[in-house]
Amino acid sequence: MTVMAESASDSRQLASNGDALYRFSSQALLAIVWTSSFIFGLYILANYAAAYFENDLLRWNNVLPEIYDPSQPQASIGIGLHFAAGGFILVLGGMQLIDSIRSNYPRVHHWTGRLYIFLSMVAAIGGLSFIAIKGTVGGLVMDIGFSLYGVLMFVAAVQTVRYAIARQLLNHQAWAWRLYALAIGSWLYRMDYGLWLILTDWVGHTEEFDGWFDHIMAFFFYIPNLL
């Protein structure tokens, strides 16, 4: 009996240690993702805002080709809204998921949450309007992939606020996580391409973003996040 009791105690201790390690690794991963995406969000705001205020919107094309076209101002407005809102949601996103803020500062959570939802919708609508007016550099496959991304982000934003209003907190939190997983997609898109460059020296990528790897990336930067 003593041996069995000791064995059961050891098993509980191992399970407890495993749970603690899981919680720590999950929190560490979230902290790394939030910090990195926070910095990337600030970069987006600084880079694209600086080009706007310096009246040098052609600089947008240095990062992503064919983003700015002086002959299509409506498309430029759409993508400008997408960049501005997208930068802010990367900065704000992780804050919405921190338990201590939700518990100790509910008003901060509620008001930043409202802003986060609004900006997510603006980012989605801005990107979708750009695709509808001008289309992406990568053609049909990229148009479909990025349009689906915008639609899913808009739906996730609506569902997040809908369940918050209904006080269905578990559903609200589930959709908030989905929205965050989508929001960091733009950051993951750059990270994935950077890693691919290091590993393969651009195998499957073209300057027109219509290579086989580009076609995969039109969906890969957000769909796995939702699984």
Predicted regions and their residues:
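Alpha-helical membrane insertion/targeting regions
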Residues: 2-227
